[in-house]
Amino acid sequence: MSQKRKLLPAALGLLSLASLSVAAADALSLQGKTIGVALVGTQHFWDREAFKGATEEVEKLGGKVIGVDGGRDNQVHANNHDILLSRKVDAVISILGDSAVEPKFKALRDAGIPVFTVDHVSQYSVNNTTSDNYTLGSTIGRYMADELGGKGNVAVFNAFSSALRICGIRYDQWKYVLKDYPDIHIIQPELAEQFANSPEDARKKTLELLSQYPKGKLDAIHVACWDQPAIGIVQALEETGRDKDVKVTAIDAGPETLEIMAEPGSPFVANVAQQPHLIGQTSADNVARYFAGQKLPVQTFIPVVPVKGPQEAKAVYKQLGYGELQ
C-alpha cells in the first residue's frame, strides 16, 4: 500500500472530527434559558465590548438576557448579583469585579445557579474566560525593551496590580522580562492612575514627572494594566515637546489608542490588543456548552494580538473590526 493511501483514512478521520466539532458548535443552544449578565461598568470600551459579545451571543443562541450595570462601583456590581439571584436566572456571566463579588458568587452557587466569570478567577466559577494575561505582560515587556535598545529609565503607571489579579499578572510578567535587561531601570516610586477620567489624570501626573526628569533622564512610560491613561501621557509629551525622546507602551489596544499609535512619529510605540467581544461571546458559548453537558476547562484563554508601530496599528484596527485607518 502506498504512503498516500495509508494517510487517506487518517485524513478522512480528521475531517470527520473537524466536521463533528463544527456541528457541535452549531448545535449550541440556550433556548428557554435566562442568563444574567453582570457588568462592573460601561465607561471603558473593553467592558462595553465584552458585555456586547456576551449578550448578543446569548440571544443568538435563543436565550434571554437580564443585564445589570455596576456603574464602575465594585460594591454596586457585587450587589447586582443579588438581583440576578432573586430573578432566579439559569446562569450568570459576571464581567470583572474585585473580591466583593465572592460571597455573591457563593450564594448563587448554593442556590444551584452556575456562575461564569470574565477576567475574574474565582473558586465559585465554573469557567473564567479571559485574555492570555501572561502573554500580554511578557510581550509588552519584550517590545518595550526592544524599543529602548535594552537600556533606559522607565516610569510605570501601576495602580491596580494589588487589587485585580489580571493586572498583577500583566505587571509581574512585564517586570519579569525586564530582569533580562539590567540596564533598564524602573523609576521609583511608581505612579498610580485614577480610573475615573484617567487620560486627564495621567496627563497631569506625566507633566509633573517630566518636570522632575528632564530630557535624557526618562526614556519610556509604561501603563501596566490597560491603556486609557496612555492617551493623557501622549498629550503631555506633545505639550512639552518630549514626544521624540520618551516612548509610551501599554496594554489593551482599544480603538482610541490604536488611532494614536497609527499617527506618523507617534511616541506610542507598542501595545498588545485584547479581543473583548470574542471573550464575552466565548463565555456565553461556554454557558451553552455547560448546559449541553460538555466538560469545560477552569479557564478559557483568548489569544492576544501584539501591536508595534503605525502600520501594525492600522492592520489590527481593521482586524478587530473597528474600521479602517488611512
Mark where each language-model region is.
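Hinge/cleft segment of the Venus flytrap/periplasmic-binding protein
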Residues: D26-K33, V177-Y181, Q275-Q326
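Short, low-complexity disordered leader/linker segments with a strong preference
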Residues: M1-T34, E59-K60, A107-I113, K215, ...
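Short beta-strand elements in bilobed, periplasmic/extracellular small-molecule ligand-binding domains
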Residues: E59-G70, N153-V156, L178-P199
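Hydrophobic alpha-helical
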Residues: D82, A91-D110, F195-I260
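Extracytoplasmic "Venus flytrap"
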Residues: G32-G53, E57, L61, I66-A78, ...
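Hydrophobic alpha-helical segments within soluble ligand-binding/sensing domains
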Residues: S29, H77, T129-A155, P199-T206, ...
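Short, solvent-exposed amphipathic alpha-helices that sit
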Residues: W46-L61, L136-I140, R165-I186, D201-K205, ...
